[in-house]
Amino acid sequence: MGDVILSPVSTEKTALLAEKENKLTLIVDRKATKEDIKREVESRFSVKVEGINILITKKGKKAIVKLAKEYSAEEIAERIGVF
């Protein structure tokens, strides 16, 4: 999916986050900063990012991206093939 965003995460939990809290969950490059992720998400999906939480797991770095209220995380997730 690019240099910063490696892939979307598709689980029941991420679907609930998209629906209830307007958040996207993405696997990102381990060296990517929050600012890098914000820039990439805003330019690629034409949305406004309100906040980013980062988790580092055995599988890599995971970013949970909260979108502004006027954008739908569910719509973006459908567009990129999460569900």
UniProtKB/Swiss-Prot annotation:
Task: Extract one GO cellular component term from the record.
Answer: ribonucleoprotein complex
Q: Name one GO molecular function term.
A: structural constituent of ribosome
Instruction: List, alphabetically, the InterPro entries matched.
Output: Nucleotide-bd_a/b_plait_sf, Ribosomal_uL23, Ribosomal_uL23-like, Ribosomal_uL23/eL15/eS24_sf, Ribosomal_uL23_CS
Disulphide linkage map: none
Q: Which Pfam families match?
A: Ribosomal_L23 (PF00276)
Q: What superkingdom does the record give?
A: Archaea
Q: Which residues form a coiled coil?
A: none
Q: Which UniProt keywords apply?
A: Ribonucleoprotein, Ribosomal protein, RNA-binding, rRNA-binding
Question: Which GO terms are recorded in the biological process aspect for this UniProt protein?
Answer: translation
Subunit structure comment from the entry: Part of the 50S ribosomal subunit. Contacts protein L29.
Q: What job does the chain carry out?
A: Binds to 23S rRNA. One of the proteins that surrounds the polypeptide exit tunnel on the outside of the ribosome.
Q: Which NCBIfam families match?
A: PRK14548.1 (NF011118), uL23_arch (TIGR03636)
The entry's family comment says: Belongs to the universal ribosomal protein uL23 family.
HAMAP family xrefs: Ribosomal_uL23_A
Q: Which protein, by its recorded name, is this?
A: Large ribosomal subunit protein uL23
Q: Which organism is it from?
A: Thermoplasma volcanium (strain ATCC 51530 / DSM 4299 / JCM 9571 / NBRC 15438 / GSS1)
